[in-house]
Amino acid sequence: MGAHGVKAVFFDLDNTLVDTAAAGRRAIEEVLPLSPPGPAAAVISVLQSKHHYGEGEARVICDKVQAKLLKECHDPAKMCITDLRISHWEEAIQETIGGEVNRNLAAECYFLWKTTRLQHLTLAEDTRGMLTELRKRVRLLLLTNGDKQTQREKIEACACQPYFDAIVVGGEQKEEKPAPSIFHYCCDLLGVQPAECVMVGDSLDTDIQGGLNAGLKATVWLNKAMTTPVDTSPVPHYIISSVLDLPAVLQKMEHKINANLGTDHMASSNE
């Protein structure tokens, strides 16, 4: 793209490039005896034989852990992510079954959930193809919030490193999205200006608001369900239902830029 166009695209990771939510659901199902045998078959067998969980109890535990993950607030200065998430399982089991706290079982559940989730985190072939083609024209950067260990493990699991010029994890920075500082840090990494960058992500509160806060050229909201945001939500420049729609959006932006340049040139020659 031209000097006045897009030089870099920043991508969110979770539920933008990889379906973390689906991987998490699959993993949480495999921890307890609710699904057909898979990578977790051995641990499921132990849970069934040693602890005699019924399906109803297992479902309640799963639901409680899922709710705790959704509301999770992690301060790495106070507790490591591993201890926090083992505590989620510990609390869910305690709240459902009662009796003495079983830290060992909670840890077993957590590590099985974590391992299984990572196994199900994949960068789809068509997404890899899109990134490969885009990188021939613009610089690409992966910008993800979250605990540094957790996010680096996800990045490794989905093997997305070769598709990006740089990768930035919020947990390794002073501030995360939507703070302007992390976006400006990304710009400096790539040697570009905010007005030459586009942010793509599924979160209005972090990806879109952050891109707006940092003065990026454009923000692209991935709205897979095509839901209607509340009136107070930040307004993205573009909305797509699939990340694969992004090249068409970038092409539309380029046409608009070229049209504006043509208009400016005509006005200048008529002066």
Q: What annotation goes with each model-predicted range?
A:
Residues 112-120:
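Surface-exposed cleft-lining segments at the edges of enzyme active sites
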Residues 1-9, 37-38, 53, 104, ...:
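Asp-based, Mg2+/Mn2+-dependent phosphohydrolase catalytic module
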Residues 45, 49, 60-112:
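A metal-dependent, Asp-based hydrolase signature
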Residues 1-62:
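Active-site neighborhood of HAD-like aspartate-dependent phosphohydrolases
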Residues 107-110, 124, 201:
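Short C-terminal alpha-helical element
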Residues 119-128:
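Active-site periphery "cap/insert" segments of enzyme catalytic domains
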